[in-house]
Regions:
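Extracellular beta-strand-rich solenoid/capping regions of secreted or surface-exposed proteins
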Residues: 11, 18, 34-50, 58-104, ...
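Right-handed parallel beta-helix/beta-solenoid
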Residues: 1-12, 31, 72
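Hydrophobic strand positions within the blades of repeat-based beta-sheet folds
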Residues: 127, 143, 163-165
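Well-ordered beta-strand segments characteristic of repetitive beta-sheet solenoids
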Residues: 25, 50-53, 166
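Short, structured coil/turn linkers that connect adjacent secondary-structure elements
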Residues: 111, 115-116, 148, 152, ...
Length: 166
């Protein structure tokens, strides 16, 4: 927790060039909005060993014992406009274009993608996986996906695209 970052730092970590293939990202309870504006949200093109939610805000130092995913809800959200629904002005959550990623104990909520923001291979509002089938997958453990919506003609609201292991 000594290296905690804000939401903008988290988004940059996921989409940037830092190697996370051997790293675990620990997330405390709270809402992490994936963009400051509408659109696709965070685009990931790399391996991430693990993203684990459900930790208390009171966690300190290197203590990882204060974790209860049902009590300390960690939400990856697209609710840019803050009205607790997926609608115009909000963003998609994760667009995975490459990498093998493990995510545990996270709720994905209020992802939204308009028809104007969507492309033929970038049209999911929740978690959209679009990469090489041999090197791109997302494994979700103890996660919830809800209230995601897309108006894209070919889009999907929840998990869509490539390989997802639930």
């Amino acid at each position: 927790w000594d290296q905690a970052m804000d939401v903008a730092g988290f988004r940059k970590l996921l989409s940037g060039s830092i190697d996370l293939s051997k790293s675990t990202i620990y997330m405390s309870q709270g809402k992490y909005v994936m963009s400051e504006t509408g659109g696709l949200g965070v685009i990931i093109r790399k391996d991430i060993k693990a993203i684990k939610g459900g930790y208390s805000l009171l966690s300190e130092g290197t203590d990882l014992t204060n974790r209860r995913i049902d009590t300390y809800k960690t939400v990856i959200s697209g609710d840019v406009n803050g009205n607790n629904q997926a609608d115009s002005g909000d963003c998609g959550l994760l667009l995975v274009k490459g990498g093998i990623i493990g995510i545990e104990g996270v709720t994905f909520q209020y992802g939204y993608l308009s028809n104007n923001d969507a492309k033929s291979n970038e049209c999911g509002s929740g978690i959209y996986i679009n990469g090489n089938v041999n090197s791109t997958s997302v494994e979700l453990t103890d996660c919830i996906i809800r209230d995601c919506k897309t108006e894209a003609v070919n889009g999907q609201g929840g998990v869509a695209g490539g390989t997802a292991i639930l």
